[in-house]
């Protein structure tokens, strides 16, 4: 494998101002085959110049540019001669910093779909696109006067300056979010910026990522040993195969059966990763240990912290039996980082790979997937030669069924979720919907209700079905499963799973809900 020089790849950087959508921008750019990464808005112009990017994108964010403490930038960035695209807050920041621009609080705030009218279809950003377009707005402020040298290129009923452009300087602003799928021509607009404005080359691929990560892992680890916690999910499995490819037997994997796994999962992990790929796996039966720690705990954040901490404790116990372990590998993804919050984004919920680590953790962390989205992880798995059925398994959180049993966890509740989830997966696959639906699972909300079975009255649990369509997990719509399929699933669950007399279907999108219930 040849060493990979990052300077050979054209790059567009995204400066982070705190939008929950900001990492989607990097994802969209990468889809074009152009390398992109999300970086701090605190970077100086000199630091950016050293990186030699083809373009810069200012992300959206929750601030008002005119407020004290609002996220700002080094104004010298505008003097670098590098194309800049400002999205939402990024556009307002551009107007606020450049002479003649003005930003004010909007009389009518916009959150959701809106219709824009393109005023200049000759402008490079809207080239070959319709005059009217559906876009996704999410703003409380707006640009009321464009800076000197700019023209208004699009407008909407509630946002007279929906887009602006200075072709001479190659500065562009969009009040709407091109990175969100609800923006009809968002990808086309970003593509125009990447290729027509920035003149970037499409020379980045997953093969390059593999080469880079293997090189980075080897440089980081040296001759030391790495410990990996296998959860049974796609992410940790891909991390295991990638690390094994990079460092071979320097990797020891610990598979903790914490009693919170899906039906038959422990056996599948040992057979596929231990057998086919030859990973050195130590299996630990810690079911009683985890359930004792979780007894009486109902708060979802506390459950996540307990599970995350206990995983580390198990690793401590097992690593004490091993020599030379210095690193702990985790399957943290981009979406985990953003949902756990950064210095610019509020925490939605702590992720088990991010917020559950104790302060006295004994290992240095390796997180080779923390710049990838879920769909990229699946692509990576297939590039590594992993079985299709393993790579395309349903996403499964590190805390396992511990966050699919709402409230206090008991063995009876876990069995209900295991059995009902298996039925759901069987029926979805039987009806050929497993590739159409991005994620599907059952939850136990902890609700009991009255029912009638046979000649008797019952007072049993309700099972919830969650099924969503998505590209990367950042936004999601509930899957419109045919009614007859839902009926079959419901009938099977009520008849085959003990202590269940009602099945409900979650029809909430993300946002406002998250995909998991806890």
Curated annotation (Swiss-Prot):
Tagged with keyword Ligase:
yes
InterPro entries per UniProt? Class_I_gatase-like (IPR029062), GATASE (IPR017926), GMP_synth_C (IPR001674), GMP_synth_GATase (IPR004739), GMP_synthase (IPR022955), GMPS_ATP_PPase_dom (IPR025777), NAD/GMP_synthase (IPR022310), Rossmann-like_a/b/a_fold (IPR014729)
Query: Could you tell me which PROSITE patterns the record lists for this protein?
Result: GATASE_TYPE_1, GMPS_ATP_PPASE
Reaction catalysed? XMP + L-glutamine + ATP + H2O = GMP + L-glutamate + AMP + diphosphate + 2 H(+)
Which pathway is this protein engaged in? Purine metabolism; GMP biosynthesis; GMP from XMP (L-Gln route): step 1/1
GMPS ATP-PPase domain: which residues?
204-393
> Does the record bear NADP in its keywords?
no
- Give the EC number(s) listed in the UniProt record: 6.3.5.2
Q: Which Gene3D superfamilies match?
A: 3.30.300.10, 3.40.50.880, HUPs
* Start and end residues of each Glutamine amidotransferase type-1 domain: 11-203
Q: Which catalytic residues are annotated?
A: 88 (nucleophile), 177, 179
Q: Which GO terms describe its molecular function?
A: ATP binding; GMP synthase activity
Q: Which UniProt keywords apply?
A: ATP-binding, Glutamine amidotransferase, GMP biosynthesis, Ligase, Nucleotide-binding, Purine biosynthesis
**Pfam families from the entry?**
GATase, GMP_synt_C, NAD_synthase
* Annotated positions binding ATP: 231-237
Q: Which GO terms describe its cellular component?
A: cytosol
Q: Which NCBIfam families match?
A: guaA_Cterm, guaA_Nterm, PRK00074.1
Summarize subunit and interaction data from the UniProt record for this chain: Homodimer.
Function per UniProt = Catalyzes the synthesis of GMP from XMP.
Recorded protein name is GMP synthase [glutamine-hydrolyzing]
Q: Which organism is it from?
A: Ligilactobacillus salivarius (strain UCC118)
């Amino acid at each position: 494998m040849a060493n990979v020089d990052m300077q050979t790849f054209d790059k567009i950087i995204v400066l982070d101002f705190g939008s929950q959508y900001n990492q989607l921008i990097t994802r969209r750019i990468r889809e074009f085959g152009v390398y992109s990464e999300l970086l701090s808005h605190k970077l100086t112009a000199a630091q950016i110049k050293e990186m030699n990017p083809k373009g810069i994108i200012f992300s959206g964010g929750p601030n008002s540019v005119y407020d004290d403490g609002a996220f700002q930038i080094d104004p010298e960035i505008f003097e670098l001669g590098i194309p800049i695209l400002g999205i939402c807050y990024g556009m307002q920041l551009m107007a606020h910093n450049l002479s003649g621009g003005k930003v004010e609080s909007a009389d009518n705030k916009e959150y959701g779909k809106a219709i824009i009218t393109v005023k200049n279809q000759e402008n490079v950003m809207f080239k070959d696109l319709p005059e009217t377009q559906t876009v996704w707005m999410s703003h409380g402020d707006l640009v009321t006067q464009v800076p000197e040298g700019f023209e208004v290129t699009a407008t909407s009923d509630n946002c007279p300056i929906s887009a602006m452009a200075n072709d001479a300087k190659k500065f562009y602003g969009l009040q709407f979010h091109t990175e969100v799928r609800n923006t009809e021509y968002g990808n086309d607009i970003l593509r125009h910026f990447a290729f027509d404005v920035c003149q970037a080359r499409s020379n980045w691929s997953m093969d390059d990522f593999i080469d880079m990560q293997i090189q980075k892992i080897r440089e980081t680890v040296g001759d030391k040993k790495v410990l990996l916690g296998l959860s049974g999910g796609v992410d940790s499995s891909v991390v295991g195969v990638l690390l094994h490819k990079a460092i071979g037997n320097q990797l020891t994997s610990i598979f903790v059966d914490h009693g919170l796994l899906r039906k038959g999962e422990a056996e599948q992990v040992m057979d596929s990763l231990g057998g086919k790929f030859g990973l050195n796996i130590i299996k630990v039966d810690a079911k009683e240990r985890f359930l004792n720690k979780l007894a009486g705990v109902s708060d979802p954040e506390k459950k996540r912290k307990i599970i995350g901490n206990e995983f580390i404790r198990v690793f401590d116990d097992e690593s004490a039996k091993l020599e030379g372990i210095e690193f702990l590998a985790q399957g943290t993804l981009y979406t985990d980082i953003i949902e756990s919050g950064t210095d610019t984004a509020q925490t939605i919920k702590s992720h088990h790979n991010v917020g559950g680590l104790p302060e006295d953790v004994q290992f240095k962390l390796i997180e080779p997937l923390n710049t990838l989205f879920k769909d990229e992880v699946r692509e990576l798995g297939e590039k590594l030669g992993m079985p299709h059925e393993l790579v395309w398994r349903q996403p499964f959180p590190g805390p396992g069924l511990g966050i699919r049993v709402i409230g206090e966890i008991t063995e009876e509740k876990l069995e209900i979720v295991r059995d009902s989830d298996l039925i759901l997966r069987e029926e979805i696959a039987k009806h050929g919907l497993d590739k159409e639906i991005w994620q599907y699972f059952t939850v136990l909300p902890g609700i009991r209700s009255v029912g009638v079975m046979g000649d008797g009255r019952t007072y049993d649990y309700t099972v919830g079905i969650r099924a969503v369509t998505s590209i990367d997990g950042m936004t999601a719509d509930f899957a419109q499963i045919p009614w007859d399929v839902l009926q079959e699933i419901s009938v099977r669950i009520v008849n085959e799973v003990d202590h269940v007399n009602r099945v409900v279907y979650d029809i909430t999108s993300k946002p406002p809900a998250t995909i998991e219930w806890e």
